[in-house]
């Protein structure tokens, strides 16, 4: 089941249930070419500018360590596919220690897939996160939308929006989306 909600805020994402787990899908068209966007999502120095500190082996099969300062999230992952400049697939392991020093959920595995498509001088990016606990899917939707917006700000040289204010603005709409997939 898929749900998309209208609202006063632009909602880039949708939520659905698949095999009893949540799926977050965020889609946005960026004002840059595919090679620049690919570099922004795969180059550790550029990732740090909008998303997270990522260390490790960023080739297929490589183990990575991810630290998202804004969310106080830390975890590990593995690069499953890296098909420049079109597709990146990473698996992550969430544990009770991943979030805010043990305040998280029981361990689970998730996949994050980014697909890029050139559209003239622009690029369409779709991020799909699978394996999220249904009780947390709204929060992941908000988080990934904020990450997509932060990427846009980074690429255009604008200042990022206040994450806490943005979170509070987006959460009701994503909670409505989550309730609809129930």
Map each language-model feature to its residues.
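Amphipathic alpha-helical segments that line or abut small-molecule/effector binding pockets
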Residues: 35-38, 149
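A detector for short, charged/polar N-terminal pre-domain segments
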Residues: 9-17
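Beta-strand/loop substructures that line and gate deep hydrophobic ligand-binding cavities in soluble
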Residues: 19, 23, 91-155
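Short beta-edge strand/loop motif at the mouth of beta-sheet-based domains
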Residues: 23-26, 32, 36, 44-78, ...
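A conserved amphipathic terminal alpha-helix motif
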Residues: 1-5, 131-182
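Residues at helix-coil transition
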Residues: 42-43, 84, 153-156
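A structural signal for short hydrophobic beta-strand segments in well-ordered beta-sheet cores
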Residues: 15, 79, 114-116
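Short solvent-exposed loop/turn micro-motifs enriched in small/polar/acidic residues
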Residues: 8, 21, 49, 72, ...
